[in-house]
Amino acid sequence: MARREIGIKKRGTSKRKLKPVYLIIAEGKNKTEVLYLSHFQDQEKNYSIRFVKAGHKTDADSLYNALVDKWEELDLSEKKGDRGFVILDIDNDPLKAQKVLALAQSNTNTAVSFVVSNPTFEVWFLLHFKYTTKQYKDGNAVIKELRRYLPNYEKNRDCFEDCKDETKEAVKNSIMLAEYYVDCEWPSIECNPRTDVGVLIACLEGEEEIRHY
């Protein structure tokens, strides 16, 4: 009988499945984004979503660095189809917008994309029900408008089922908004409202490649 080799398996050296890994990180104070995007973790998808814990610091630098650290820990590679997505709100804050823009421009990993919303992620939900170029003072103003269609909407509430039938409409509306602001720098507070979530969803559905800034 052939002798079987027995050895110690080192951490990080095991072969992972061939499915590409999509790393996603979002601001830690809200579970809204994670709750929504977790519905795209379909076993039949040709990728696997992994959420990265944001920790207490939710500024753009901290989110980006946390995702890059996890990327390196998992030994991910663009050549294998792995992707990273940093989901951010700029809250009509010019300093936040400038920080995200600078970070995106200095990012050397072309597999990592920034998914930005202004004022907040809720713009994406609102676009399921209407196309609008109306400007919003802040995230609360967006939520107030959203409650016309989802009266029970609250932060950290899973509203995927309430929106899923209009996802294609929301993608179309988000692309129309991007075209509306085509002459404006992005991210910037001039683009209000605007969100990249539609492009991310199209990417997750295999319909469109997400762009880079």
Regions found by a protein language model. Give the residues of each.
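Short, glycine-rich nucleotide/cofactor-binding loops
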Residues: E27
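Eukaryotic endosomal/vacuolar membrane-trafficking regulators centered on PX-domain-mediated PI3P pathways
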Residues: D59-L67
